[in-house]
Amino acid sequence: MYAWTDGACRGNPGPGGWGVVLRYRGHERTLHGGEPHTTNNRMELTAAIQALEALDRPCVVHLTTDSQYVRKGITEWMAGWKRRGWRTAARKPVLNEDLWRRLDALNQRHEVHWHWVRGHSGHAENEQADALANRGIDEMQEAGAT
């Protein structure tokens, strides 16, 4: 299973969206959504959460994000945060703890291999996830305007 995720925010904080591209054995599924008042980091985390929550059963997932915050958070920083009672090395509360806890549980359910790609560098699936994240914002705003 392959997943590409992206988050977007217009203003930070501001309206935000998330996008996911899932691919398995030649089949592709896309997901997207938006929130009226959020941050870019929350949308990046939400995209990864939505990708993993969409999977019906535990599996091996190669998840690619353009967010170092997400990749490093889950692969490097998480163990220390948990050891310190969800505090950073500076003893401050971990931002977005609610989402990190959800992502941690999903990361334990699946065998996730975390990959990073530079955003807006022409990587096709990352660009698709970015377009979906922006569609999430657009559709949310259009729905609110009617």
From Swiss-Prot:
EC number, as in UniProt: 3.1.26.4
Organism domain of life: Bacteria
Cellular-component GO terms for this entry: cytoplasm
SUPFAM superfamilies from the UniProt entry: Ribonuclease H-like (SSF53098)
Keywords attached to this entry: Cytoplasm, Endonuclease, Hydrolase, Magnesium, Metal-binding, Nuclease
GO molecular function: magnesium ion binding; nucleic acid binding; RNA-DNA hybrid ribonuclease activity
Residue positions binding Mg(2+) 2: D6, D130
Entry-linked CDD domains: RNase_HI_prokaryote_like
Domain RNase H type-1: 1-138
Cofactor note: Binds 1 Mg(2+) ion per subunit. May bind a second metal ion at a regulatory site, or after substrate binding.
Catalyzed chemical reaction(s): Endonucleolytic cleavage to 5'-phosphomonoester
Function (record text): Endonuclease that specifically degrades the RNA of RNA-DNA hybrids.
HAMAP family, per database record: RNase_H (MF_00042)
UniProt-recorded name of the protein: Ribonuclease H
Species this protein is from: Alkalilimnicola ehrlichii (strain ATCC BAA-1101 / DSM 17681 / MLHE-1)
